[in-house]
Amino acid sequence: RLGGGGCGVEMALMDLAGKAYGVPAYMLAGGKYRDQIRVYSDTPSKKDPVEMGNALKERMERGFTYLKMDIGIWISEQVEGGLVFPNDYSDDKLNEGSTGGSLKSMMVEAQNVMHPFTGIQLTDKGISEISEYVKIVRDIVGYEIPIATDHFGHIGLESCIRLGKELDKYSLAWYEDMIPWQYTNQWKQLKNSVDTPVC
């Protein structure tokens, strides 16, 4: 997302340099290391875990051997008391909303605030709801294939650690973007607190 433009320019420049030198661009990056690479299949968010499990299963049937799904605090909204909001996100604001009146609109507002500063926290009920979602998906897909995860939401480090510890039992491939990349000390804490790789 943030690096896409720069990466596109770099790839174009390497292609131009390769043409100028009469060599493939990969030679400028150190040479050829493999003939093929494994790709994963990302999957759009689904509120229903059975739908998500079936969507992942369909990707397996198409030959993908590595999967990725979005899980996050939007799952916790399905249970009352799943999230703790700051005072300025009272029920009235969530019902009327400064940008449309729903948890989704509040999340849009939160997109402009870095994760550690939103004040949004997962409760035990919220963590259980997300865990149950992943359990249902794993029951459908099985454990024979890696599943990576992304889009956890704008929550702080403590909620990320609590959620990560709960989800470790599902043998997920990795937790992606739980916190912003520039908070390196928090990444270290997260990495040292969970058994699943983080990126």
Where are these regions (language model features)?
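Conserved residues at beta->alpha junctions
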Residues: 43, 151, 178
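Active-site core of metal-dependent hydrolases
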Residues: 164-181, 198-199
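Catalytic alpha/beta core domains of metabolic enzymes, predominantly
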Residues: 182-199
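N-terminal capping/lid subdomain adjacent to the active-site entrance of alpha/beta enzymes
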Residues: 1-146, 154-161, 165-169, 193-195
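Short acidic loop-to-helix transition motifs that present clustered carboxylates
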Residues: 154-156, 180-184
